[in-house]
């Protein structure tokens, strides 16, 4: 347990940040899951719309440091490839 005043403050800040990041991470996963669900349903139009909504969220989370930029790029590339495969 934190003993000094500054350590207590850091512990509080850390917990607050953890909760905020957990919320953001959950939101990110929800957007990605919506795209995956539309792909599994075989609905190209819905998948494209869901991907268009998810793409800026993924980019924003990478910018904020919640996920690595390469992971964001990987998410977008794989989802986009699966959407394009629906048409072919």
UniProtKB/Swiss-Prot annotation:
InterPro entries: Ribosomal_bS20, Ribosomal_bS20_sf
UniProt GO MF annotations: small ribosomal subunit rRNA binding; structural constituent of ribosome
Gene Ontology CC, one term: cytosol
Keywords: Ribonucleoprotein, Ribosomal protein, RNA-binding, rRNA-binding
Pfam families (alphabetical): Ribosomal_S20p (PF01649)
Region (Disordered): 1-27
GO biological process: translation
PANTHER family reported for this sequence: 30S RIBOSOMAL PROTEIN S20, SMALL RIBOSOMAL SUBUNIT PROTEIN BS20C
Protein family: Belongs to the bacterial ribosomal protein bS20 family.
Function: Binds directly to 16S ribosomal RNA.
Protein name (database record): Small ribosomal subunit protein bS20
Organism for this UniProt entry: Shewanella oneidensis (strain ATCC 700550 / JCM 31522 / CIP 106686 / LMG 19005 / NCIMB 14063 / MR-1)
């Amino acid at each position: 347990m934190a003993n000094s005043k500054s350590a207590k403050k850091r512990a509080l800040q850390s917990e607050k940040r953890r909760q905020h990041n957990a919320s953001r991470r959950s939101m990110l996963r929800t957007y990605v899951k919506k795209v995956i669900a539309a792909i599994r349903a075989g609905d190209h139009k819905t998948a494209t719309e869901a991907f268009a909504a998810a793409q800026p969220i993924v980019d924003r989370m990478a910018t904020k440091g919640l996920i690595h930029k390469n992971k964001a790029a990987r998410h977008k590339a794989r989802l986009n490839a699966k959407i394009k495969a629906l048409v072919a």
